[in-house]
């Protein structure tokens, strides 16, 4: 009986899981990626969120951004894993999947000289995360250092929606 139970467990463990609604993918964020990102989202309201696997506040904020993305499909949501501590793609992808951000455009810093990448985004940025940059339709950028409050994101979204009327 014990062998039968162990065999059943082994069989269940080998079966594929339920298909994910959408599998997250990571693009490599390297020199020139910031300008490429801005160019590809030009004319659309875009929320760019810098986060990291080892960032405590990011673990709380990512699911909130997933909810924001679900409620506001007119906003392009981009996440960039800019962790100071190198981490695996699998860890980042797992967090994005859990947070409901699989359908977002997801990037990961891929240059060993992260300071150069941060400088391209904002010359004054010292690497603190979480960090959110809200890019309006006309390219105007608003930076939120630390956790982005849901009310601030909603206010920005309402301004973007009003600008199209």
Enumerate the language-model features and the residues they cover.
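Conserved redox-active cysteine motifs that mediate thiol-disulfide chemistry
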Residues: 50-64
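Short, internal strand/loop/helix patches
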Residues: 95-129
């Amino acid at each position: 009986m014990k062998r039968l139970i162990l065999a059943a467990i082994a069989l269940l463990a080998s079966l594929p899981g339920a298909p994910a609604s959408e599998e997250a993918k990571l693009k490599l964020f390297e020199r020139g990626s910031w300008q490429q990102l801005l160019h590809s989202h030009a004319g659309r309201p875009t929320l760019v969120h810098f986060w990291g696997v080892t960032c405590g506040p990011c673990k709380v904020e990512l699911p909130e951004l997933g909810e924001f993305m679900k409620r506001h499909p007119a906003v392009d949501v981009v996440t960039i894993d800019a962790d100071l501590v190198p981490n695996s793609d699998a860890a980042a992808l797992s967090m994005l999947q859990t947070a409901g951000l699989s359908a977002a455009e997801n990037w990961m810093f891929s240059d060993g000289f992260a300071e150069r990448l941060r400088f391209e985004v904002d010359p004054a940025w010292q690497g603190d995360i979480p960090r959110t940059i809200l890019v309006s339709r006309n390219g105007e950028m608003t930076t939120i250092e630390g956790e982005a409050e849901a009310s601030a994101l909603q206010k920005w979204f309402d301004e973007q929606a009003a600008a199209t009327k």
